[in-house]
Amino acid sequence: MDLFDRINKLKEEGLNEIKQAENQKMLDKIRVELMGRKGELTEILHSMKDIAPENRPKVGQEVNQVRDLFQKQLDEAKNNFLQTLIAKKLEEEKIDVTLPGREGHLGSKHPINIILDDLESYFIGMGYEVVQGPEIETDHYVFEMMNLPKDHPARDMQATFYIDEENLLRTQTSGDQARVLEKHDFSKGPLKMVGPGKVYRRDDDDATHSHQFQQMEGLVIDKNVTMSDLKGTLEMIAKHVFGQDRKTRLRPSYFPFTEPSVEMDVSCFNCDGKGCPICKYTGWIEVLGAGMVHPNVLENAGVDSTVYGGFAFGLGLDRFAILKYGISDIRDFYTNDVRFLAQFRKEED
């Protein structure tokens, strides 16, 4: 068989193999066998040294024509495979535009955020400033500035997460009060602020306790602020959140940063003050603590306690939400159950 017969036979067999290829992988293998560095066309070119010089141009021309033909057929086959693949993918992933769209799920605010936003708006309307301090606080601001020096026995009331000897996760937002007191210029007017935020205590999580909860503390400092001002403010808060018919009472208590100190109760939501298991048959439920700011707290912040005085209060936003909405387990706030959260959508209006 001469070289021209070999070229023609290779052309016929090569075109047939390309035609019968079933996928791109087979096509790539055929390309290498026909046109690769060790392919059959390359071998023919290498064998041209054994033919007469006058025939070499013609053989080279034949080889190039066959190479171009192979390349054309390979490209066409590759394009066909690609089109088939695209068509298959479109068929598998097609969207029926006549189907109705999926209904969107309307979100809702978290019940604690509903309480928080409502109280912030309420206090802003009464001229209070909303202040937020750091959650990682210093012992100085959380305790010492609030009349709780080191080794004070009342520190045992606080189950604290200490980061190191000086820094801690705040157990209350009172540190915000101390920071504002230090900087406030009383020549420009009285101080009225609320400080909401997360606080942390080493409690075991159960239906009524959590190691993390949200608190809001309030502070009013001016000349001639009295206990009557505090009582009126607390009553307004209770009636705003729990309803105008809710009865309130103050009981003596103890907090290191206030003197005198009180706790406020509201009439039981379940029995309306008649007595039931929820209120332990007292007719009352505790909602917050408060008192007149201790002179030491003022002096620690550089405020003359003989000229200025005021009151402070602290309330648990989680507790307010539990009482207002009748929630039995505080853990419901943090389990992200959309069925639980959806029921508060109407409360946002």
Swiss-Prot record:
The keyword Cell division is assigned to this record: no
Reaction(s) catalysed by this chain, per the record, are: tRNA(Phe) + L-phenylalanine + ATP = L-phenylalanyl-tRNA(Phe) + AMP + diphosphate + H(+)
What are the required cofactors?
A: Mg(2+)
Any Gene Ontology CC annotation: cytoplasm
Q: GO terms for biological process?
A: phenylalanyl-tRNA aminoacylation
Where is the protein localized? Cytoplasm
UniProt: Mg(2+) binding residues = E259
Q: How is the cofactor bound?
A: Binds 2 magnesium ions per tetramer.
Keyword RNA-binding in annotation: no
Fill in the subunit field for this protein.
Tetramer of two alpha and two beta subunits.
Q: Which HAMAP family match?
A: Phe_tRNA_synth_alpha1
Q: Would you identify the family this protein belongs to, as annotated?
A: Belongs to the class-II aminoacyl-tRNA synthetase family. Phe-tRNA synthetase alpha subunit type 1 subfamily.
- Which PANTHER family does the entry mention? PHENYLALANINE--TRNA LIGASE, MITOCHONDRIAL (PTHR11538:SF41), PHENYLALANYL-TRNA SYNTHETASE (PTHR11538)
- What is the designated name of this protein? Phenylalanine--tRNA ligase alpha subunit
